[in-house]
Amino acid sequence: MERLLSTREVAELLNIHEKMVYTLVAEKGLPATKITGKWLFPRYLVEQWVENNTINFPERIRPLTANQRLIVLAGSNDILLDQTITLYNRSFPGHLAVFGNLGSTGGVQALRNNLCHIASSHLIQDDESDYNFQFAASECEQMPVLVNFARRQQGLLVRRDNPLSIFSVADLGKPGLRLVNRSLGTGTRLLLDRELDKAGLRGDRITGYDHEVARHMDVGLEILAGRADVGPAIEAVAGALDLGFVPLRWERFDLLVSREVFFEEPIQSFFGLLQSDPFRAMARALPGYDVSQAGKIVFPENR
């Protein structure tokens, strides 16, 4: 079960008076449940609520049309995705793909607001049985098409010789350990918070829990520079920076696209690259990727 916060703990987390917490529940939709007369708050839902209410998107743009040559991707960052965008721009002169690093939650919200054509996301669902569908259904008026990009290995980055003997999330409770974390709204942060809950650890008691960086590579660079001992990131970063890696789980990383633009030529050209030899070669050169299902439409596990 996810860790539940008390009213006092939520007030401390949000830096507000306890009475204001009840106002937020009644008027602003702060996620809460009442058990035996006592209000309790799932921490990860509170964090999502904060993220949803602090991102201010500009006015909507029109979805991609057939005479446009621009693809805007937004959401979770990924090393292989960066390389794929470069491959697209090189393969289709006169077309341009660009990426906005908003985290998985921000990407789905950008798709909802027509601020991007493709959202990249790896948001694990409440029961951990699937990815992205639950969040897309709650954020988007119409369910987007989900296309698999890759399965990738998530875990903990450590120094090459792992001097602190970190072998699981439970080891993050060791005294003196310094964590570097990912930003709220990222799928990696959501995964880490879930794993901390399972291990019975509180993030606010871990040094560096609030030390947030925007990209997987930034986590590795903080460890490489000696400013942190451990942080959540994908295995490909460990390979790129010669760091140690503690695997946690394989996850599905999807690309979400609205049905209105799915069949547009630039979109189909981008997805077509996911089944090309150059794409597979790039994936083989990076540790921690499985692209056997890349480019295929994904359907919910429990239909």
Predicted segments, located by residue:
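Short helix-initiation/N-cap motifs at beta->coil->alpha
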Residues: G100-Q109, D204-L221
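Short loop->beta-strand "edge-of-pocket" segments that line small-molecule binding or catalytic clefts
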Residues: N67-N77, A170-L190
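Periplasmic-binding protein-like
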Residues: R3, L146-Q153, G239, L243-G272, ...
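A ligand-binding cleft/hinge motif common to bilobed small-molecule-binding domains
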Residues: H122-A136, G220-R249
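Short beta-strand-centered segments that line the small-molecule binding cleft or hinge
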Residues: G107-Q153
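Flexible hinge/capping segments at coil-to-helix
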Residues: F149, V158-L179
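Ligand-binding cleft/hinge of the Venus flytrap
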Residues: I85-P93, A170, R182-L184, T188-H211
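N-terminal hydrophobic or amphipathic helices and topogenic motifs
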Residues: M1-G106, R112-L115, S138-M143, V169, ...
